[in-house]
């Protein structure tokens, strides 16, 4: 498929920190813990907006970070949860994890949403840790960091205008001079082997997406040449621009080319013939082109509008682009009935990858034991090491998870260095 492609960074909002606080009211001596919880961060959510056509906006903004939750407050007041960050994407956007190439979401329908980066939960305040043995704990949690990752967005482009015609009639040249697209251009058939997309803006500031599709040949509806894939792509377009080589230099008759291409469109799917079609007579700067155009007009009829142009010399391009923009304004979207069968019964909305083991122990070249893993790193990030109670709780949780025992099994002895992210401590058996 013909895709737009961009890499971006997304990060869910961090949770707010829990607070250590105590009641200090008049006539209430020795007040208990009163620290509130932090609020949850915001998710990064992608939402399909049917009015969008390309990923061009992501070329200029590549970082999306949801807001963090509010910190907990005294008097048991919890921090406010953050709002989700909603990012609009065009229909047909596929979101993939850059590191694993796993598909996170396939977004196809207007209004469809998918959580791309999960928010962190808020840390608990000290009122959550009160026990009969420790009724006034100086202990709270930091907010959980939000999920962060680099993702790749690929768009199955829904072009407004599709350029069709035999190979080497000048479709790629036309696209290259009316847009910033840089398709491969060569004096041989099938130079274009993948579709190219160009964004066009007319002098009166109307814009549309134009696709240069690989050349069609007789039998394309049966898969001959570059076949079904690109005929299917024409089906996504609203207007077809039929480019014909009027120079006759390929040894073909322009009128026969015109009939052959239209027959292929008809044979592939009758609905393709419902698309408005603009006929473009290209290479009018070549010898014999005027004579061939006169003969062509006589065969198709004087009531059929033809736009004579030269993509190389840019003759007639302004009038052509205005005509295309005018036609798009009055042409509705065409439903893609055939694609319903290709989609799965349940559209992919959201998929998290497995979080893996709680912890893993490896050994560095210098003999240091390295602890890693989703659960233990999450615990580390949410621990407030500036407070003695926080350090003690962290040590208790390591023992409860079996980290001490696992270190002994790996040969750890008194005084050995153990590292967890940027934190180093000595192992005590």
Swiss-Prot record:
Major localization listed first in the record, in broad terms: cytoplasm
Protein purpose: An essential GTPase which binds GTP, GDP and possibly (p)ppGpp with moderate affinity, with high nucleotide exchange rates and a fairly low GTP hydrolysis rate. Plays a role in control of the cell cycle, stress response, ribosome biogenesis and in those bacteria that undergo differentiation, in morphogenesis control.
Domain OCT: 351-429
Residue ranges of domain OBG-type G in the record: 159-329
Assembly behavior: Monomer.
Region annotation Disordered: where it falls in the sequence: 119-143
Family, per entry: Belongs to the TRAFAC class OBG-HflX-like GTPase superfamily. OBG GTPase family.
Enzyme class: hydrolase
UniProt subcellular location: Cytoplasm
One term of GO molecular function: GTP binding
Positions of Mg(2+) binding: 172, 192
PROSITE patterns: G_OBG (PS51710), GTP1_OBG (PS00905), OBG (PS51883), OCT (PS51881)
UniProtKB keywords: Cytoplasm, GTP-binding, Hydrolase, Magnesium, Metal-binding, Nucleotide-binding
Protein name as annotated: GTPase Obg
Pfam families the record matches: DUF1967, GTP1_OBG, MMR_HSR1
Gene3D superfamilies with a match to the protein in the record: GTP-binding protein OBG, C-terminal domain, GTP1/OBG domain, P-loop containing nucleotide triphosphate hydrolases
Native source organism of the sequence: Lysinibacillus sphaericus (strain C3-41)
